[in-house]
Amino acid sequence: MATTKVTRNRRTASRPSKRRSPGATHVVIIGAGRGGTALMEIFANDPLVRIVGVADISDQAPGLGLAKRLHIRVTRNYRQLLKMGPVDLVIDVSGNPEVGEYLQDIRRMGVSVIGGASAKFMWQLI
């Protein structure tokens, strides 16, 4: 009598795959205030965007609850975002100048970055 091996899918929604989703732009968002929350709401149902992670220094940032409901990884340390999986685009809506300095190095690694005046302009469009 043949036996069937049953395997369980160990990947859960709270632990997204580190593999690249074909055709999707892999995005991380720095800042989970109003701007970051609005971006998550827009990107959440877009099949061409996969939000890899969200960072905010405040545990009380309004967007963190939304990120958790959407099964998006969250961190207080924005430097951890690039370790969460493949990243094509970083969007900085934190308003923190220190983050902008760090993102200059990220650009050199070939990752696209939207921050500063560009992020402010995008926020005004939303």
Language model features with spans:
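Rossmann-fold NAD(P)-binding glycine/threonine-rich loop
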Residues: 97-126
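Short acidic-hydrophobic, aromatic-tinged amphipathic segments that line or gate anion-handling sites
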Residues: 73-80, 114
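A short, basic/flexible loop-to-alpha-helix module at the beginning of a structural domain
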Residues: 2-24, 79
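Conserved acidic residues
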Residues: 52, 86-88
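NAD(P)-binding Rossmann-fold cofactor-contacting core
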Residues: 46-70
